[in-house]
Amino acid sequence: MAQMLLHGTLHATIFEAASLSNPHRASGSAPKFIRKFVEGIEDTVGVGKGATKVYSTIDLEKARVGRTRMITNEPINPRWYESFHIYCAHMASNVIFTVKIDNPIGATNIGRAYLPVQELLNGEEIDRWLDICDNNREPVGESKIHVKLQYFDVSKDRNWARGVRSTKYPGVPYTFFSQRQGCKVTLYQDAHVPDNFIPKIPLADGKNYEPHRCWEDIFDAISNAQHLIYITGWSVYTEITLVRDSNRPKPGGDVTLGELLKKKASEGVRVLMLVWDDRTSVGLLKRDGLMATHDEETENYFHGSDVNCVLCPRNPDDSGSIVQDLSISTMFTHHQKIVVVDHELPNQGSQQRRIVSFVGGLDLCDGRYDTQYHSLFRTLDSTHHDDFHQPNFATASIKKGGPREPWHDIHSRLEGPIAWDVLYNFEQRWRKQGGKDLLLQLRDLSDTIIPPSPVMFPEDRETWNVQLFRSIDGGAAFGFPDTPEEAAKAGLVSGKDQIIDRSIQDAYIHAIRRAKNFIYIENQYFLGSSYAWKPEGIKPEDIGALHLIPKELALKVVSKIEAGERFTVYVVVPMWPEGVPESGSVQAILDWQRRTMEMMYTDITEALQAKGIEANPKDYLTFFCLGNREVKQAGEYQPEEQPEADTDYSRAQEARRFMIYVHTKMMIVDDEYIIIGSANINQRSMDGARDSEIAMGGYQPYHLATRQPARGQIHGFRMALWYEHLGMLDDVFQRPESLECVQKVNRIAEKYWDMYSSDDLQQDLPGHLLSYPIGVASDGVVTELPGMEYFPDTRARVLGAKSDYMPPILTS
C-alpha cells in the first residue's frame, strides 16, 4: 500500500482490547475461571512469569508516536481508555496499534492492528474494533482492539502560516503551563556585551535596541536577593567570577560565585542548588574529551556551609524496565539552567519584593564567559588566563597557549507571572530530589513577596506574553498526576506508566507551523526526524531520534515552494559538537546531522523540481557555523610550552584559527516570536523522558508581523546577533525571507569560510559567520566540498561516520 503524508494532528483514543492470548501463562486465553485456577497454581509454585502487564502503542509505520500505561492482571481484556494528541509529519500507509506484554527486559508482542491512512485523510472520525494480527497479518484468534481516530490536516488549520496574528493569541495548547500576560523579558547574547559594541539598530516607536549584560545582571540579582536564591544547572563552578569587564567594575565584583553564594546564605537568604550528579560521567563521551562538570567539587565546596547544594542524578520514572532505568540514570542529564531570586520592585521606596527568573543556555561554570569578539588568543593574559577552556584537544592548557574555545550562548531574564512558573518548576524538582524540605513557604511571606501579577500594563507597548515549556517526567518533578485522564488535563503526555512534559517540542512544532516568512535557529545540535532518513547503512527505526522539528521545517519550506511564496530557514550550529573531533561520539553525531540535512534538502529539491524551478536549495534552507581567525599581535600572551607536534592543537595554533562554539538553544520566527532555553534540537532534549530541559516562548503583542514586519525587541535582538556574526549591518537583513537577503548572507559566509580555511592569513576575519562546509547536489544529497573532507587542522570528517560501538540513544 502506498505511503501518504500525514502532516497535522492526530487525535487518537485506545479504549480496550478483547480476547487476547497471554503467552506468559499456561492458561493462555482460556475461560476466566480456568485462567484464575491455573495462574494461581503458577504463582504458588513459582512457575510462569508472574503478574501480566499489558500496554499498547501507536506507530505511524515504524515511528512510535504514542504509548498507553500498563494494565496489570487483565491480560485478556485490558481497558485503557487513554487519549492522545499527536503531532504528525510522517509518510505512512497504516496507523499501527501494537499490544505488548511488559518484561523486566524488553517486551513480548501479542499482535498488531492496522488502520489504513487513506481512511483518515477526509478528516472524519473513525470509531472501530480492529483485528489484532500476527507478523503474517493473520488474525490472532478473536483478539481485537477498540480505537477511535480523527486526523486534522495542517493545511486546514486556520493558524497555519498565519503567524501570531492577534494580541489574543492564547499560546501553545495542551501544555502544563499556560501563557502569561503582562510580563517583561530581557534578551541576552553571550555572557557579556562590551560598551559600544552594538551599533544603532532602529526599532518601532522611534526607539533603538539596547543590549543587556547577562552575567552582570545575574551578579546583581544574587547580590540583592533578601529571601531566596534557587539555582539549577548541568554544571555550576564555584571558582568563576561573574563580573570581568575592567571598564564596568562593580563593588564586590571580584568575588567568586561560590563566595557570593556563601555570603548570601550566611546573611539568612535561603540558597538552594540542584546540580546534575554526573554519576558515571557518561564514560564513552567523557573519554572523548567532554568537559568535566565539577559536580563533586561543587558539593564539597559547600559542604558544612549555609548553602544547600544537592547533587541530583537523572533518575528514571518508577515505571521503566531494568534496561530503560539503567539507560536513563547513566546516559541522560539534568540540563535545565535557571536562577530564581526575590528582587526589589522598580519603585525603590517599597519594601515589597517580587520573583525574577533567568532561563537559557548559559551554565554558571567555567568556559562560558565571553563577549561578541570571541577572541582566540588576545584574552589569554587577562579575562581567560584563569578560565582557559579547550576540551577539543586532549592536552590543551593555558601553559601551551591558544586557541581557546570561544563560547556563544543566549539567555533571558523573565519578570512577571512567568517568573513564578520557573519558581514552580524548581519547587517541583526540589520536592522530588532535594531531600529535606527547605523550600521557603512564600505564602508566609505574602506581605513581603507579592504574588504573581503583571509587571507591565496592558497598554504598555513593551509588554510581553510568555509561556514556559519543559522536557521532564515524573522521575524528576514532584506532583505529576497519576492517571492518564488527569495528565491530559494538565497538558502532559502519558507513556508506559510514566507521565511526561514534552512541551518544548510542542512549542517548536507550533511556532514552525504558524511561521509566515522566515525562521532563524541557533542550536548546539541539529538532528532528528530519523524516521524519514534514508536507510543507507542503518535501519532508521533503530535510531529513535523521532522528534519532528527538522521534518516540520522541511515541510514548511515545501509548502511555501508549492504556494509560490518566499520562505527561508537559517540554521547556525557549531562546526562540530564539543569534544575531540575525530572521536567516535563526535563523528556519530555529525553523521546523524548529515542525514538530517539530507532528508530536508531531499524534500526541498523534490518540491523545486515538481514546480519546474531551477534554484539553489540553499536559497531556502541554509546552514552556518561560527569561527574566528586572528593575526598575531605584539605583546600577546606567550605560552611557556608548546603543543605536541603534528596534532590538531599545534596545527590550529599555527593557523591561528578555531571554531566559536555555538551552545545556543534559540529559534526566532518572523521577528515576532522567540524560544530560548536549555533544549538542543536532538532527541535527548526533545523527548521529555531523557534530558530534563526548560525554555520560554514569547512575543510582544504590540510588535507582530501582521500588516508590516515586526520591529520590537525580538527584531532588534536578531539584528544584534547578525551584527555579531557578520560584522556588519545591511538594510536587506530586515527582510530575511527575501532572495536578496539569503543570497547576500550566503555570499558573505562563503567568503568568510574561504578566509578561515585558507593557507594564507593576512587579516583578522571581518566576521564570524561561516558557511557550513557542505555541498548540496541537485537531488538533495549532502556532499563534501572539493578538497574539504576534513575540518581544517584536523583529521575529522565533516560528514561524520557511523559508530559501530556508540549506541544511538547516547548520541541522538
Curated annotation (Swiss-Prot):
Temperature optimum or stability note: Stable from 4 to 37 degrees Celsius. Activity is reduced to one third of the original level after incubation at 50 degrees Celsius for 30 minutes.
SUPFAM superfamilies: C2 domain (Calcium/lipid-binding domain, CaLB) (SSF49562), Phospholipase D/nuclease (SSF56024)
Residue ranges of the propeptide: 1-46
CDD domains the UniProt entry points to: C2_plant_PLD
Reactions catalysed, as given in the entry: a 1,2-diacyl-sn-glycero-3-phosphocholine + H2O = a 1,2-diacyl-sn-glycero-3-phosphate + choline + H(+)
Any one GO BP annotation for this protein: phospholipid catabolic process
All residue ranges annotated as the C2 domain in the record: 1-130
Domain named PLD phosphodiesterase: residues: 330-368, 658-685
Binding site for Ca(2+): D190, H374, H408, E724
InterPro entries in UniProt: C2_dom, C2_domain_sf, PLipase_D/transphosphatidylase, PLipase_D_C, PLipase_D_fam, PLipase_D_pln
Enzyme class: hydrolase
Active site: H335, K337, D342, H663, K665, D670
Family, as annotated: Belongs to the phospholipase D family. C2-PLD subfamily.
Protein name listed in UniProt: Phospholipase D alpha 1
GN (gene name): PLD1
